[in-house]
Amino acid sequence: MSVASKNLFDLLGEETPAATTTEKKTAASRDKKRSDSPPVPRELVAQSTTSRKRDPNQPTPRERTVNKKADQPRRRRQAPQGNEAFAREGKEARANNAAHPVDATGAPSNRRNARARRGREFDRHSQTGRVDTKKATERGWGDLVNSAANPDVAENEGNTPSGAQTPAAEEENVKTLDEYLSERKSAAKPVGRTVEKLENATKVEKSAPEELFASLKKSASQKKSAAKESKPKKVLLDIEQTFTARPARGGRPNRAPRRGPSETASKTQQAPPTLSETDFPALA
């Protein structure tokens, strides 16, 4: 908001017309120069945040960390396993597991059965040129030495059936209750040793052995008895006690008042003197 100002001193007419015209000309020429001359671009310089103490040729701490990480070999991220893999893959993992068989034939894997099915093609150790040992051969096909020494036994072994000799059936031992009770009654009871009686024999009773030597170590019972004897015994005395009746409490005693002597005290202590003629002989 602009307010037009009015020069009140123009009424005095002190200013010359030449001065006003020169000032107007100078102001007009100044405005013309400003409008004719093109604007000069101003150079903006950013404030430097770097310290003068740091060497500009050396890399910054951030550049050092970036270069260090670039030089290190990139670690391979480990694939998830177990429950983590199952949780990440979800239904896809279950579908893939169901699609793939357990082994080549689709049967549950068993190392022995799998080895028997696949043969000896992928064995770690070669089996060419290997022969069973003598002990294994004799166990599987019999002992050749014993068969040659006892040909009769060998022939009998060949004629016998494959099964072993069946043992004879055992007879069942079954008894009734009456038979069992009768056997128990008939069984002889054990008889104790009979005491032989001797003639001209005297009865000897054993007594406690006498202590020939005083034992240095005391038994537990002796220690307890000695401890009981050493303890002081309590002595009880009979005392005759007499009780007297408590005297009855009297009334409140006469006490002097707080502000001066009491009336009773003044009567007893300050009684008026009795005067007689003997006290005044001059008046007789």
Swiss-Prot record:
The modification Phosphothreonine is found at residues 160, 166. SMART domains: HABP4_PAI-RBP1 (SM01233). InterPro entries: HABP4/SERBP1-like, HABP4_PAIRBP1-bd, STM1-like_N. It is found in: Cytoplasm. One of its GO terms (biological process) is TOR signaling. Residues 263-277 have a biased composition (Polar residues). Its main location: cytoplasm. Residues 1-284 are annotated as: Disordered. Keywords: Cytoplasm, Phosphoprotein. Ribosome preservation factor that protect a small pool of nontranslating, vacant ribosomes in cells under nutrient starvation conditions. Under nutrient-limiting conditions, cells reduce ribosome biogenesis and degrade ribosomes via autophagy (ribophagy) or proteasomal degradation. To avoid excessive degradation during starvation, STM1 binds to and protects 80S ribosomes from proteasomal degradation. Under nutrient-sufficient conditions, TORC1 phosphorylates and inhibits STM1 to prevent formation of dormant 80S ribosomes. Belongs to the STM1 family. Associates with mature 80S ribosomes. Binds to the head domain of the 40S ribosomal subunit and prevents mRNA binding by inserting its alpha-helix domain towards the mRNA entry tunnel at the decoding site, where it blocks the binding of tRNA and mRNA at the A- and P-sites. Interacts with eEF2; interaction sequesters eEF2 at the A-site of the ribosome, thereby blocking the interaction sites of the mRNA-tRNA complex, promoting ribosome stabilization and hibernation. Interacts with sad1. This is Ribosome-associated protein oga1. The gene is oga1.
